[in-house]
């Protein structure tokens, strides 16, 4: 059985997320998804939704076999526990595949690192970014406190 790991923030799920997970699932037989903890998201605004809610939504998606929240300190700890054959990176994720491969080798994990294919918008106003969804909500409904 080929185990695949996909990872990300998965805040405000959109068609790009679904495409990434479908692509990742096609790389093997079993898809494990690791969701970044809110406190570990430093490369962009933190997620709007809580960790458990994001995990539960991702777990409910058809391509996903297992979903878990990432480790609070060591992003590779869940990868070691899963021992995947493939890590599927999103086509636009900021991760350096070579650095990931080096860390996997240092930890004794024999695992390929692949990039998922991009998902192009299928119509003019389709939104494929959680940040863009949040911006659109603020623009249409106002920037007021709930």
From Swiss-Prot:
ATP binds at residues 9-10, 14-17, 92. Keywords: ATP-binding, FAD, Flavoprotein, FMN, Nucleotide-binding, Nucleotidyltransferase, Transferase. Its cofactor is a divalent metal cation. GO terms for molecular function: ATP binding; FMN adenylyltransferase activity. It catalyses: FMN + ATP + H(+) = FAD + diphosphate. NCBIfam families: cyt_tran_rel. Catalyzes the transfer of the AMP portion of ATP to flavin mononucleotide (FMN) to produce flavin adenine dinucleotide (FAD) coenzyme. This is FAD synthase. Belongs to the archaeal FAD synthase family. Disulfide bonds: none annotated. The keyword Nucleotidyltransferase applies. The gene is ribL.
């Amino acid at each position: 059985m080929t185990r695949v790991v996909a990872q990300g923030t998965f805040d405000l799920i959109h068609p790009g997320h679904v495409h990434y997970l479908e692509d990742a699932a096609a790389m093997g037989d079993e898809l494990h998804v690791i969701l970044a903890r809110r406190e570990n998201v430093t490369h962009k605004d933190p997620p709007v939704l809580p960790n458990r809610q994001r995990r539960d939504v991702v777990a409910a998606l058809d391509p996903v076999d297992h979903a878990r929240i990432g480790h609070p300190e060591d992003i590779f700890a869940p990868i070691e526990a899963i021992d995947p054959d493939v890590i599927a990176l999103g086509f636009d994720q900021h991760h350096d595949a070579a650095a990931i491969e080096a860390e996997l080798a240092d930890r004794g994990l024999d695992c390929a690192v692949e990039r998922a294919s991009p998902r192009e918008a299928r119509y003019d106003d389709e939104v494929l970014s959680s940040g863009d969804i949040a911006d659109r909500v603020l623009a249409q409904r106002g920037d007021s406190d709930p």
